[in-house]
Amino acid sequence: MSALDDRITLLRETNATLEAIAQVLFKSWFVDFDPVRAKAEGRQPEGMDAITAALFPDSFEESELGLVPKGWEIGELQDLLVLQRGFDLPASERTEGAYPLIAASGPSGTHHIAMAKGPGVVTGRSGVLGKVFLTLEDYWPLNTTLWVKEFRRATSCYAFELLKLLDFASFNAGSAVPTLNRNHVHSLKYVLPPVELVESYEGTALSIHQRVLENNRQAQTLTQLRDTLLPRLISGQLRLPETETLLEKAL
C-alpha cells in the first residue's frame, strides 16, 4: 500500500508545483511586468520566444494606477469579466451526477445537471469570501457564489489568477454573514493588457491546469482503490500476492 500512498503524494505535489508555475507566470507578465522591464533594459525576456516577446512594449508610461506598460489601457474589472450570482439548489433536490457543485467554500458534491459551461471561475459571495476556484468541466455554481458569466477581455485562467489577487474580505458588505457585492468588484480600476497577450497566457496556463485535472482524477482513482483494498487485505478476503498484482496494474 505504501506504493499507492507514494504515488498519490507525488501527484498532489506535482499539482502544487504546476499551479505555482501558472501563478508565477501570471504575476511576472501582468503584475510585475518583467518582460517589459527586460526590454526596457535592452534584454530579451528570459525564457520567452520572439513572437511572445513582441507582444510586450519596451517602455512604461504614467497612469492613474502608477507606471504601466506603454499602450496598455486603464479600465475597470468589468471590462475584463462579468460576475453573476450562482443558482439555488436545495440539498433535497440534488442528484449525484457528472457535474461538480461549487459552493463558496469549494467543490460540494455533484449533480446530474450543469448550469454553466466550463472552463469556469467561481468565488464566494456569501459566508466564505476570498476563495477562488477554476473548473475545466461544466458545473453548477451554487447561490453562495459569484461565477464569471462573461469573459470579456479575460480568459478562464487569466480570470482565475486575477481574482486570487483581490482582497475580497475588504469588500464585505454584510454584517453577521460575510457578503460580497459584485458591483464593488466590477468597478475596480485595473490595467487592461492586450487581448493577444491574455490569449497567449491562456494557451500555456490552460495546458497546465488540464494536467492538474488529469492528476487529480488519477489521485482520486488511486485513493478509492487503496480504500477498497485495505479493508479486504486486513480482513483476509484478499491475499498479499493478489493485492500486489492489482497495485501493479494500477501503477
What are the residue ranges of the model-derived segments?
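Non-catalytic DNA-recognition/assembly elements of restriction-modification systems
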Residues: S2-D32, A50-A103, V195-E202, L206-E242
